[in-house]
């Protein structure tokens, strides 16, 4: 029964979800695969400043609060209420983990901000993942492709099966979207000579926009859909996927899975300062798993050798362990990520608005550079962001088979 009728029993979580349905705004669906949110540090968005994880945390807190009978005051642990000087959380976590999880192969990277689980087969990984996830930290898991049918994810295989379909393709240089035959995209995926040219003769840097996604993915590619790992989390029907437990009358967001495919720009001579990416800076509205299932090797005139690509990657501000991976001949790098904690969103937003004004761009009151995904923060800007706002970039190289798991509220660009 409702709490108003019986104070001894609190409302159920479903009751609270139902009565709060009008308040929940799931926001943008430009995200990947949902995990059940376990924390919320996302920046305020919109006029209300409320995000979905914030509201759900409030709901769960209300359930706990309403379960306490009014005639029995909760016991307060005085020691827990008296807080000492803040400690280095990262150091505490690492010291504790090294003792409790000695049977797990793991490392801390990016100034101890990201957990790297090196053995995807270890059945105890979830224990350490859970501890890290409570802190709202990104997680990197290596070797996930070894659990998958690699032949399904080759560019050649996808082109052969679906090349006759039409899809929206974005040119990352000028942000122009065109609807074209999928085969044209895949023909130039590894052969630079077959890539489209723009009006000035430059080679286009193309991205296949979220094709296919959600229910379309399952219907179009059932074999690939069921080849995806972590179905209990990643499947729309997964028991540990919070979205699968929402009441039926909710408008369900498209949380994937989706296939994200793009040409690489690091292999080309003409890009020196990496001023563009294939995914601009944006904020995640749900927890996300991104698995690098295939890395194409570009060939043709104007393409750097593998050693040349590695040299360019080494110019990035990388963790020592990532530099070591680059030198491992068995590893194949495929994507460069820049990740930021959700708590830094306001500073980043203010910084980008400042840069826009410096460049003479119009900054409207309702303009949000993060929500609009209008910026790729290049190396010079990342340095300024650190010097002027104290926001440090977490740079991660994603190798073939790596799964990058980001909590809701995190920001990233690729």
Task: Annotate each PLM feature.
Residues 58-61, 65, 69-105, 268, ...:
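Eukaryotic intrinsically disordered, low-complexity regions enriched in serine, threonine, and proline
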Residues 33-35, 76-78, 337:
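Hydrophobic transmembrane signal anchors and adjacent membrane-proximal interface regions, especially
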Residues 7, 19, 24, 29, ...:
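Generic detector of intrinsically disordered, low-complexity, polar/charged segments
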Residues 8, 15, 20-41, 47-54, ...:
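N-terminal low-complexity, Ser/Thr- and acidic-residue-enriched intrinsically disordered segments
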Residues 1-2:
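Cys/His-rich Zn2+-coordinating "finger/knuckle" modules used by eukaryotic regulatory proteins
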Residues 92-137, 145-403, 410-414:
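Active-site region of the double-stranded beta-helix
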């Amino acid at each position: 029964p409702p709490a108003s009728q019986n104070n001894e029993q609190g409302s159920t979580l479903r009751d609270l979800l139902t009565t709060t349905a009008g308040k929940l705004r799931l926001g943008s669906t430009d995200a990947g695969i949902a995990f059940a949110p376990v924390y919320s540090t996302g920046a305020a968005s919109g006029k209300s400043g409320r995000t979905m994880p914030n509201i759900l945390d409030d709901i769960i807190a209300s359930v706990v609060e309403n379960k306490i009978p009014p005639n029995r005051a909760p016991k307060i642990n005085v020691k827990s209420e008296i807080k000492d000087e803040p400690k280095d959380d990262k150091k505490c976590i690492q010291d504790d983990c090294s003792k409790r999880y000695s049977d797990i192969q793991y490392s801390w990277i990016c100034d101890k901000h990201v957990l790297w689980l090196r053995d995807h087969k270890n059945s105890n990984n979830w224990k350490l993942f859970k501890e890290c996830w409570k802190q709202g930290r990104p997680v990197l898991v290596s070797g996930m492709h070894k659990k998958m049918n690699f032949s399904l994810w080759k560019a050649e295989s996808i082109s052969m099966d679906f090349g006759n379909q039409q899809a929206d393709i974005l040119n990352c240089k000028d942000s122009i979207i065109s609807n074209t035959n999928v085969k044209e995209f895949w023909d130039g995926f590894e052969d630079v000579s077959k890539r489209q040219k723009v009006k000035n003769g430059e080679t286009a840097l193309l991205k296949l926009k979220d094709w296919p996604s959600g229910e379309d993915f399952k219907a179009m590619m059932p074999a690939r859909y069921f080849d995806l790992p972590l179905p209990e989390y990643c499947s729309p029907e997964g028991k540990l996927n919070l979205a699968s437990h929402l009441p039926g009358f909710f408008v369900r967001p498209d949380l994937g899975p989706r296939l994200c495919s793009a040409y690489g720009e690091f292999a080309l001579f003409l890009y020196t300062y990496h001023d563009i990416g294939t995914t601009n800076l944006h904020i995640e509205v749900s927890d996300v798993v991104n698995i690098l299932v295939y890395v194409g090797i570009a060939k043709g005139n104007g393409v750097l050798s593998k050693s040349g690509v590695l040299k360019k990657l080494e110019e990035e501000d990388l963790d020592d362990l990532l530099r070591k991976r680059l030198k491992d001949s068995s590893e194949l790098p495929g994507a460069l990520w820049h990740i930021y904690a959700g708590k830094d969103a306001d500073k980043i937003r203010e910084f980008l608005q400042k840069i826009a004004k410096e460049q003479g761009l119009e900054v409207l009151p309702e303009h949000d550079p993060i929500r609009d995904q209008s910026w790729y923060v290049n190396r010079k800007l990342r340095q300024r962001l650190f010097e002027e706002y104290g926001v440090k970039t977490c740079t991660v190289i994603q190798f073939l088979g790596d799964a990058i798991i980001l909590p809701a509220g995190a920001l990233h660009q690729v």
